[in-house]
């Protein structure tokens, strides 16, 4: 497992404990020392993970072993039938979507997938959507509306693909169209930010009735590196930018950008993915039961007001 900078001391404790346990298999002389070290390790973990900086949490969010959209879909749904294509240009492999059943409830699930190794990351375009990806997502959402199925959108992208070809095919227009259409799609929409939620790539699939966010995910108009490059002309100022952007879950909840924080295991989702899947599934099933009871007209009005009120402030 990749060790993050703030976890090095924790890893040293773990290595020492493992070494002593091997030594104590034939001689229990180390048992008391092992017990003391394990207690110190627990205290150290609580201390380190309770005082994470915004940048450290971004490193957790970007950890190579963090569960991706395909993992969540596989573990959350009792059944899943993938659907492909935008019916216009081509398939975008950065989007995985289809018909699913979660907690016994039929729905449409759409996730942004970055890939887990070099080959799959290239295949998935590192989770950066092209215009056809946004069109594919919208096609699935309109199908969900037609059959009155709730929609679950899993966000995990460093941003929409900024290539020339994507711009020529109408990248900005595709995102803008999704913003407009998602605001008036007449079926419940639950947004869940499972990793990186960056820029228009996330926003183009991020309009919904409820927005949940994993504890160490982030949601921002730009990456810290991009912000630092623009404001300070120095990408190495990413730590300062991460703090200034207010992109972590607690800040976004206080600013009323998101509605709920979904707990992760101590140290991040990659330390115990199954606990993370359980927590996300519990959140989704609870919200599905709540939203399905709200009349459609009220649901649309509340969705519109939710986003209109973001960023409002009163002058003293």
Swiss-Prot record:
Residues 36-290 form the CoA carboxyltransferase C-terminal domain. Its EC number is 2.1.3.15. GO terms for molecular function: acetyl-CoA carboxylase activity; ATP binding; carboxyl- or carbamoyltransferase activity. Disulfide bonds: none annotated. GO terms for biological process: fatty acid biosynthetic process; malonyl-CoA biosynthetic process. One of its GO terms (cellular component) is acetyl-CoA carboxylase complex. Keywords: ATP-binding, Cytoplasm, Fatty acid biosynthesis, Fatty acid metabolism, Lipid biosynthesis, Lipid metabolism, Nucleotide-binding, Transferase. It catalyses: N(6)-carboxybiotinyl-L-lysyl-[protein] + acetyl-CoA = N(6)-biotinyl-L-lysyl-[protein] + malonyl-CoA. It is found in: Cytoplasm. InterPro entries: Acetyl_CoA_COase_a_su, ClpP/crotonase-like_dom_sf, COA_CT_C. Pathway: Lipid metabolism; malonyl-CoA biosynthesis; malonyl-CoA from acetyl-CoA: step 1/1. It comes from the Bacteria. Belongs to the AccA family. Component of the acetyl coenzyme A carboxylase (ACC) complex. First, biotin carboxylase catalyzes the carboxylation of biotin on its carrier protein (BCCP) and then the CO(2) group is transferred by the carboxyltransferase to acetyl-CoA to form malonyl-CoA. Acetyl-CoA carboxylase is a heterohexamer composed of biotin carboxyl carrier protein (AccB), biotin carboxylase (AccC) and two subunits each of ACCase subunit alpha (AccA) and ACCase subunit beta (AccD). This is Acetyl-coenzyme A carboxylase carboxyl transferase subunit alpha. It comes from Protochlamydia amoebophila (strain UWE25).
């Amino acid at each position: 497992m990749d060790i993050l900078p703030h976890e090095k001391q924790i890893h040293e404790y773990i290595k020492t404990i493992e070494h002593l346990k091997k030594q104590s298999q034939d001689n229990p002389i180390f048992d008391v020392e092992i017990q003391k070290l394990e207690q110190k390790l627990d205290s150290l973990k609580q201390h380190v993970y309770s005082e994470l900086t915004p940048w450290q949490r971004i490193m957790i969010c970007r950890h190579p072993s963090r569960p991706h959209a395909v993992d969540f879909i596989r573990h959350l749904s009792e059944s899943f039938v993938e659907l492909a294509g935008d019916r216009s240009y081509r398939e975008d492999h950065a989007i995985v979507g289809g018909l699913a059943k979660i907690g016994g409830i039929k729905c449409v699930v759409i996730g942004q997938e970055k890939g887990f190794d070099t080959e799959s990351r290239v295949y998935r375009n590192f989770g950066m959507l092209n215009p056809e990806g946004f069109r594919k997502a919208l096609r699935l959402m309109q199908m969900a509306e037609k059959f009155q199925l709730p929609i679950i959108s899993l966000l995990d992208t460093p941003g929409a693909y900024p290539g020339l070809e994507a711009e020529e095919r109408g990248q900005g227009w595709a995102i803008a169209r999704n913003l407009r259409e998602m605001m008036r799609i007449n079926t419940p929409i639950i947004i869940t930010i499972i990793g990186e939620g960056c820029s228009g790539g996330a926003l183009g699939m991020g309009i919904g009735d409820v927005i949940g966010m994993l504890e160490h995910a982030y949601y921002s108009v730009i990456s810290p590196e991009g912000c630092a490059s623009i404001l300070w002309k120095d990408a190495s100022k990413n730590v300062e930018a991460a703090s200034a952007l207010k992109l972590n879950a607690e800040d976004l909840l206080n600013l009323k950008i998101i509605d709920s924080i979904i707990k992760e295991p101590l140290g991040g989702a990659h330390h115990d993915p199954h606990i993370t899947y359980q927590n996300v599934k519990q959140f989704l099933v609870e919200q599905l039961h709540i939203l399905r009871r709200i009349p459609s007209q009220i649901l649309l009005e509340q969705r519109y007001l939710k986003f209109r009120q973001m960023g409002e402030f009163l002058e003293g």
